[in-house]
From Swiss-Prot:
Sorted UniProt keywords: Amino-acid biosynthesis, Metal-binding, Methionine biosynthesis, Methyltransferase, Repeat, Transferase, Zinc
GN (gene name): metE
Designated name of the protein: 5-methyltetrahydropteroyltriglutamate--homocysteine methyltransferase
Species assigned in the record: Alkalilimnicola ehrlichii (strain ATCC BAA-1101 / DSM 17681 / MLHE-1)
UniProt record, GO biological process: methionine biosynthetic process; methylation
Pfam families hit by this protein: Meth_synt_1, Meth_synt_2
InterPro entries recorded: Cbl-indep_Met_Synth_N (IPR013215), Cobalamin-indep_Met_synthase (IPR006276), Met_Synth_C/arc (IPR002629), UROD/MetE-like_sf (IPR038071)
Source superkingdom: Bacteria
Length: 773
C-alpha cells in the first residue's frame, strides 16, 4: 500500500469553532486560556480524523489562530519594530496586533499588509523584511503542538512553510534590499527548528515551497540549492512540497535538491509526472497530489488507480499519495450538508471525505483492497457517470445565447473622454469625489433578521421591510457624513458572491461549507454545477429604493463575473472561461435593468481578477483575454452617461495594468493604504486613462485613520495621477466593521477630501440633477 498523508487540513472547525473563539477573545468575552483550549480541541479533532481515516501520517503544524505564514514570521522572530520589542518569545497577542493592528494587550499599531496567497482566495500576512534584520527562534508553539500530537500517539509529519517561499512572500521595506541577502539568517533558524524537531522524535518534515511553481529568477533558483544543501545536514527527512501548478522551468532545480522526497501537484499539472519520474533519483520519495485539494468534486478512484498502477509498479514504497495541496481551501465535512439535493451531494467530497478517498486509493494500489474499497470506487465511478449524464447541467437556451455574442457586445458606445464628459454633466461631482466600496456594517440585527427569515420566524414581507429600514439608515448616515456618491449598504446580502449565486440558475449552496479567507473571516463559496442564467432581476429593487431616498447619485453594486467564478467551486466539465462568459451574460442583464431603473453609477467588483492569473507568465495572455472579455461583456450594455466603476483589492497591479486599462471601467478603486500607496508607483510609467480611487484607509484594521494620514496618502497619489481623475474612498467594503468604527473614519475621509479640494482647486458646488423620486 502506498503511504498516504495530507499537506494540511482545515483549521476553522466544521462549525467555525475557531472563528467564534478568536472573535470572542478579541472582544474580551473569553480569556486567552479559553482560546488556547479551543485550539487544542480542534487540533486533536483534526488529527484524530486523519488517524481514523487510516492515513499513514498525521500532519502537524498546519494550525494557526490567524495565518500560517504569520506563524512562521513569529517563529523566526520577524516582528516589525512598530509592534515593540517582542523579546525572546513572540506571544499570541503580538501576532494578532501584526494581523489586525490591535489585540487585547499591547499598543495598537498599523497592521501588516495582507494579500492573496498565490492564486487562491486565502489571505496571508506579508512578512516585512529590513536590511540587517536579525532572526532567531522566537516561538515554542510548533514544538508544543508536536508534543501534543505525539502524546496522543499519532505518527507525526510536521509541515512548515519553506524558507525560500517565506522570503518570496515577504516584502523588502528597506530601499535597495535584496530579500535573498537575508536568506542565511533565515536558514540558520530553520536549521535550529529541524534540529529540535528531530530531538522530539519527528522523522519527516514537509517544507512547503509553492514558490517553485512560479517563474523564478536565476538567483532564486541558485538560492534554493544553497539553502537546502545547508538544511540537509539536519536530523529529519525533508519532503519538499510544491503545489498550485507544475514545476515548469524549476523542475531541474527542485529534483536536484538534497531532500528525501518531493510532492508535486498532479491535478493542476498532470503532464509533469512523466518528466519527474524520468529524473527522480532512486532514493527519493515521490508524493503525488492526485485528489483535488481546491475543489469539491468527487474523484474517480478507479480511474486514478488505473493511471497510477504503473507508477506504483515503478516506485514501490517510494510512492506517496496526497491531495494536490492543503485541504485548507475546501469545506470541512460533507456529512453536515443534510439539505443539499441528493443527486448533487453524491457528486461531492469535502475535506473529511477526501481523507477517505485517499485511503481507498492507497489500498486499491496495494494488496490490501477489500470489498469495501472496491465498493467505494464503484460508487465514485457511478456518481461521475450520473453527473455527466444529468439533465440539470446543460441548458439549450444558454448555449444559444453564447453563440449569439459578437464583438459589439463587448464595446461601450464612446471612448472614455466622451463618456466622462456626459457623466460629469449628469453627476455634477466636486473635485476629489468621495464614495465607499459598497457594503456597510452587517450588524447583529441584520444577521438575526436573515436567520429568522431562513428559519421561517420572519415572513418575506417583514424581512423586506427590515432591510428597507437598514437601507434608509445607511443612506441617511452617508448624507450626514457628506459622501458624494452613495451606496445602499448591502444589508440584504449575506456574501458578495453567495447573494448572486442564490439567484442564478446553475448554482448550489451549502449550509456549513465554510472556508477560511483570512483570520476569523470565513466564506461559504457556492458550487457552480451547471449552465448559468438569470431568471429575474437580483438587485434592482434595493438600489431603486435607495435612490428614491436621496438626491445624490446612488451606485448599483454587482460582483463581477471573474470574481463570482474565482470565489466559487467551479464545475470541471468545461473550460472555466465558458462558465465565466455565462456568468457575464447573466450580470449584463442586471446592468441593463439597473440603468433602466435610473441608477446613474454601477460598480462591478472584480477583486479576484489578479487572483485568477496563472502562476506562470506564459499562461497569462490566455487568461487575461477571456477575463477582460467577460468584464466588458458585463459592462458594455451600459449607456455612455452611466458611470461604470470597478473595485480591486489585495492586488499587485504593475504586471497587468495594460489588461486593467482594457477593462475600460470609468472609475477603478483599489487597495493601497496598507502598502502606503506603493501600488501607485506603476502609474509613473503607465498613464492610466480613466479615473481612479486609491484606498485611503485600511478597513481590515479597527483603528481610525487620521485626517492628516489620508491627506498625505492622497497627496502621494496626486503626484502620479491628475487630480481631476482622483476619487477618495476606503480600501474595501465596510461589512466587517462596526458603525462606531465606520462613522469617524468616513468623517475623517470627507474632511480630508475637503482639505484636498482647497489645496488643489476651488471646491465645486454640487448641482443635484436627480432630485428625490
Amino acid at each position: 500500500m502506498s503511504t498516504t498523508h495530507v499537506l494540511g487540513y482545515p483549521r476553522i472547525g466544521a462549525r467555525r469553532e475557531l472563528k467564534r473563539a478568536t472573535e470572542a477573545y478579541w472582544k474580551g468575552e473569553i480569556d486567552q486560556a479559553e482560546l488556547e483550549r479551543t485550539g487544542r480541541e480542534l487540533r486533536a479533532r483534526h488529527w484524530q480524523a486523519q488517524r481514523d481515516a487510516g492515513l499513514d501520517w498525521v500532519t502537524v503544524g498546519d494550525f494557526a489562530f490567524y495565518d500560517h505564514v504569520l506563524n512562521v514570521s513569529a517563529l523566526l522572530g520577524a516582528v516589525p519594530p512598530r509592534f515593540g520589542d517582542a523579546g525572546e518569545t513572540v506571544d499570541l497577542d503580538t501576532t494578532f496586533r501584526m494581523a489586525r493592528g490591535r489585540a487585547p494587550t499591547g499598543e495598537p499599531a498599523a497592521a501588516c499588509e495582507m494579500t492573496k496567497y498565490f492564486d487562491t482566495n486565502y489571505h496571508y500576512l506579508v512578512p516585512e523584511l529590513h536590511a540587517d534584520q536579525r532572526f532567531g527562534l522566537a516561538s515554542r508553539r510548533l514544538f508544543d503542538e508536536v508534543a501534543e500530537a505525539r502524546a496522543a500517539g499519532h505518527p507525526v509529519k510536521v509541515v512548515l512553510t519553506g524558507p525560500l517561499t517565506w522570503l518570496w512572500l515577504g516584502k523588502a521595506k528597506s530601499p535597495g534590499l535584496d530579500r535573498l541577502d537575508l536568506l542565511d539568517g533565515v536558514v540558520d533558524v530553520y536549521g535550529e527548528i529541524l534540529q529540535q524537531l528531530g530531538e522530539q522524535g519527528v522523522e519527516w518534515v514537509q517544507l512547503d515551497e509553492p514558490a517553485l511553481v512560479q517563474d523564478l529568477p536565476a538567483d532564486w533558483q541558485q538560492a534554493y540549492e544553497r539553502a537546502y544543501h545547508r538544511l540537509q545536514a539536519g536530523p529529519v527527512k525533508l519532503l519538499l512540497a510544491t503545489y498550485f501548478g507544475g514545476l515548469g522551468e524549476n523542475l531541474s532545480t527542485a529534483l536536484n535538491l538534497p531532500v528525501d522526497g518531493i510532492h508535486i501537484d498532479c491535478v493542476r499539472d498532470p503532464d509533469q509526472l512523466t518528466a519527474v519520474l524520468d529524473r527522480l533519483l532512486p532514493h527519493k520519495v515521490l508524493s503525488l497530489g492526485v485528489i483535488d485539494g481546491r475543489n469539491v468534486w468527487r474523484s474517480d478512484l478507479a480511474a486514478l488507480a488505473r493511471t497510477l498502477a504503473p507508477v506504483r509498479e515503478r516506485l514501490g514504497e517510494r510512492l506517496w499519495l496526497a491531495p494536490s495541496c492543503s485541504l485548507l481551501h475546501v469545506p470541512v465535512d460533507l456529512d453536515l450538508e443534510t439539505e443539499l439535493q441528493p443527486q448533487l451531494r453524491r457528486w461531492l467530497a469535502f475535506a473529511r471525505q477526501k481523507l477517505d478517498e485517499l485511503v481507498v486509493l492507497g489500498r486499491l494500489l496495494g494488496d490490501r483492497a477489500g470489498a469495501a474499497d472496491e465498493q467505494a470506487a464503484a460508487e465514485a465511478s457511478a456518481a461521475l457517470a450520473d453527473r455527466q449524464a444529468s439533465t440539470h447541467i446543460h441548458k439549450a437556451e444558454v448555449a444559444e445565447r453564447m453563440q449569439r455574442v459578437g464583438p459589439a457586445d463587448r464595446q461601450r458606445g464612446q471612448p472614455y473622454p466622451e463618456r466622462a464628459r456626459k457623466q460629469r454633466k449628469r453627476l455634477a461631482l466636486p473635485l476629489f469625489p468621495t464614495t465607499t466600496i459598497g457594503s456597510f456594517p452587517q450588524t447583529a440585527e441584520i444577521r438575526a433578521a436573515r436567520r429568522d427569515l431562513k428559519a421561517g420566524r420572519l415572513t418575506p414581507e417583514a424581512y423586506e421591510a427590515r432591510m428597507r429600514e437598514e437601507i434608509a439608515f445607511a443612506v441617511a448616515r452617508q448624507e450626514e457624513i457628506g459622501l458624494d456618491v452613495l451606496v445602499h449598504g448591502e444589508a440584504e446580502r449575506n456574501d458578495m458572491v453567495e447573494y448572486f449565486g442564490e439567484q442564478l440558475d446553475g448554482f448550489a449552496f451549502t449550509r456549513a461549507g465554510w472556508v477560511q479567507s483570512y483570520g476569523s473571516r470565513c466564506v461559504k463559496p457556492p458550487i457552480i454545477y451547471g449552465d448559468v442564467s438569470r431568471p429575474r432581476p437580483m438587485t434592482v429593487r434595493w438600489s431603486e429604493y435607495a435612490q428614491s431616498l436621496t438626491g445624490r447619485p446612488m451606485k448599483g453594486m454587482l460582483t463581477g463575473p471573474v470574481t463570482v467564478l474565482q470565489w466559487s467551486f467551479v464545475r470541471d466539465d468545461q473550460p472555466r472561461s465558458e462558465t465565466c462568459r455565462q456568468i457575464a451574460l447573466a450580470l449584463r442583464d442586471e446592468v441593463a435593468d439597473l440603468e433602466a431603473a435610473g441608477i446613474p453609477a454601477i460598480q462591478i467588483d472584480e477583486p479576484a481578477l489578479r487572483e485568477g492569473l496563472p502562476l506562470q507568465q506564459r499562461q497569462w495572455p490566455g487568461y487575461l483575454d477571456w477575463a477582460v472579455d467577460c468584464f466588458r461583456l458585463t459592462a458594455s450594455v451600459a449607456q455612455d452617461a452611466t458611470q461604470i466603476h470597478t473595485h480591486m483589492c489585495y492586488s499587485e497591479f504593475n504586471d497587468i495594468m495594460g489588461a486593467i486599462a482594457t477593462l475600460d471601467a470609468d472609475v477603478i478603486t483599489i487597495e493601497t493604504s496598507r502598502s502606503d500607496m506603493e501600488l501607485l508607483e506603476v502609474f509613473e510609467g503607465f498613464e492610466y486613462p480613466n479615473e481612479i480611487g486609491p484606498g485611503v484607509y485600511d478597513i481590515h484594521s479597527p483603528n481610525t485613520p487620521s485626517v492628516d494620514w489620508m491627506v498625505r496618502l492622497m497627496e502621494k497619489a496626486a503626484r502620479r495621477i491628475p487630480v481631476e481623475r482622483l476619487w477618495v474612498n476606503p480600501d474595501c467594503g465596510l461589512k466587517t466593521r462596526a458603525w462606531a468604527e465606520v462613522e469617524p473614519a468616513l468623517q475623517n475621509m470627507v474632511a480630508a477630501a475637503e482639505i484636498l479640494r482647497e489645496r488643489y482647486g476651488q471646491a465645486q458646488t454640487r448641482v443635484a440633477t436627480q432630485g428625490k423620486r
